[in-house]
Amino acid sequence: MSITSLKNQKEFELINKLGKKFHERYFILVIAKKLPKIFLESKYNTFLGIKVSRKLNKKAVVRNKIKRRIRHLIRIIVSDSKLKAIKFAMIIIPRKGFEEINFSHLNCELSKIILRNI
C-alpha cells in the first residue's frame, strides 16, 4: 500500500482537469484514473489531495482532525480492496457536517464511490 499526497497547486489543477467529480452530501470527490507522466513515473500507486476550507470550520484543530480522518479512511479503503495495484489520484473536499458524521457511514459512502468508479 503506497499512498502519497499531492504536493503543489499544479498537481491539484491537473487532477481537477483530468478527473471526474462526484458530489455527495458530506464531500466532493475528484477521481482521475488517467494520470499524467509525472505521476506514472512515481513509485506510489495512490495520490491523495485534501482541501479543507476555512469556511468549513475556523479552528485549525478541527480542520486537521478532518484531514486525519480522511487519510485514515483512504488507508482502510486502499488496503482492504484491489486498489493496491491500480494507479489513480483523488482529491477530497469535505462539506459542512463532515466532522459530525459517523466514521463507519463515511467509510461506507467513500468506499462505495471509489470502488465503483475505479
From Swiss-Prot:
It catalyses: Endonucleolytic cleavage of RNA, removing 5'-extranucleotides from tRNA precursor. The keyword Hydrolase applies. Its EC number is 3.1.26.5. One of its GO terms (cellular component) is ribonuclease P complex. Disulfide bonds: none annotated. GO terms for molecular function: 3'-tRNA processing endoribonuclease activity; ribonuclease P activity; tRNA binding. The keyword Nuclease applies. It comes from the Bacteria. Keywords: Endonuclease, Hydrolase, Nuclease, RNA-binding, tRNA processing. One of its GO terms (biological process) is tRNA 5'-leader removal. Consists of a catalytic RNA component (M1 or rnpB) and a protein subunit. RNaseP catalyzes the removal of the 5'-leader sequence from pre-tRNA to produce the mature 5'-terminus. It can also cleave other RNA substrates such as 4.5S RNA. The protein component plays an auxiliary but essential role in vivo by binding to the 5'-leader sequence and broadening the substrate specificity of the ribozyme. Belongs to the RnpA family. This is Ribonuclease P protein component. It comes from Rickettsia felis (strain ATCC VR-1525 / URRWXCal2) (Rickettsia azadi). The lineage of its organism: Bacteria, Pseudomonadati, Pseudomonadota, Alphaproteobacteria, Rickettsiales.
